[in-house]
C-alpha cells in the first residue's frame, strides 16, 4: 500500500520543553504520537523512549503480529520508566507518556493506545474517533455524568487513567478496521484536540494538501494560546 504523510510538532506558547515525540515510517506503514509527563526533561525522555521502541520493532507484514510486538515493546518501556522514576529522575515521582499508534497493511489497520492522545479517521467527509480516551472525563461521559461538549473544559480534563510508566498494571487498547483509498488518519496529542473541535479537524482534512492542513492546525492552536505542546501525524491512504 502507498501513503502520503505529514507530521508536525510545536512546543506551544506556555511550555519551555516539548515533551511530545512523533514516529513516522510510511514505508512500513507505522506511525505514532507520544505525549510525555514528569517534569524537567523526564517527559521528553519518556515519549522518546516509546517512539524509539517502536522504531526498533521487527519488520512484519502481519498486522496482528505488529500490534503484539508493539504492546510488548511498550510493556518493556513501562518497566524501564518505573525504574527510572524510582531512581529519582522525576520531580513528580512518575515518569510517563501517552501513546497512540497506527499500523496499516493489506487494506486493514490496527490502532493501539494508552492515555488521551487520539486517533481519528476521516472518510468521505465524516470524522470518527478510532481511539477512546483513557481519562477521568471520558469515564464520566461514558457513565452519562458529563456531556461530551463539557469534557474538554472540565477542571479534571488533564487527568488520564492510563499511561506508559504510570503503574505496573499495564493494558493497551487495540482496535482494528478496514482502510480505503482516500482515507485520512490523524494521530494527535491533546495539545491539538483540546483546542480544536472534531468538526474543525474534518474541515481541514477534507480536501486540500496535507501540508497545508497540518500547518493550519498548528497555526489555529497557536492563535488560541497553545497552552500545551502540540503534535500531529496525518496519513492519507492512496
Model-derived features: positions:
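PP2C/PPM-type serine/threonine phosphatase catalytic domain
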Residues: 1-238
Amino acid at each position: 500500500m502507498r501513503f502520503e504523510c505529514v507530521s508536525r510538532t510545536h512546543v506551544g506558547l506556555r511550555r519551555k520543553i516539548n515533551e511530545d515525540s512523533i514516529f513516522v515510517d510510511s514505508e512500513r506503514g507505522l506511525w505514532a504520537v507520544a505525549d510525555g509527563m514528569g517534569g524537567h526533561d523526564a517527559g521528553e525522555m519518556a515519549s522518546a523512549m516509546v517512539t524509539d521502541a517502536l522504531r526498533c520493532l521487527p519488520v512484519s507484514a502481519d498486522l496482528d503480529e505488529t500490534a503484539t510486538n508493539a504492546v510488548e515493546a511498550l510493556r518493556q518501556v513501562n518497566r524501564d520508566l518505573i525504574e527510572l522514576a524510582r531512581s529519582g529522575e522525576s520531580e513528580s515521582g512518575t515518569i510517563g507518556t501517552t501513546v497512540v499508534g497506527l499500523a496499516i497493511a493489506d487494506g486493514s489497520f490496527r490502532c493501539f493506545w494508552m492515555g488521551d492522545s487520539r486517533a481519528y479517521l476521516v472518510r468521505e467527509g465524516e470524522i470518527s474517533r478510532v481511539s477512546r480516551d483513557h481519562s477521568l472525563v471520558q469515564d464520566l461521559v461514558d457513565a452519562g455524568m458529563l456531556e461530551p461538549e463539557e469534557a474538554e473544559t472540565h477542571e479534571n480534563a488533564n487527568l488520564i487513567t492510563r499511561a506508559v510508566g504510570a503503574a505496573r498494571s499495564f493494558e493497551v487498547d487495540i482496535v482494528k478496521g478496514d482502510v480505503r483509498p482516500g482515507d485520512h488518519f490523524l494521530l494527535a496529542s491533546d495539545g491539538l484536540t483540546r483546542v480544536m473541535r472534531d468538526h474543525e479537524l474534518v474541515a481541514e482534512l477534507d480536501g486540500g494538501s496535507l501540508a497545508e492542513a497540518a500547518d493550519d492546525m498548528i497555526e489555529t492552536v497557536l492563535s488560541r494560546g497553545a497552552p500545551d505542546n502540540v503534535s500531529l501525524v496525518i496519513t492519507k491512504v492512496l
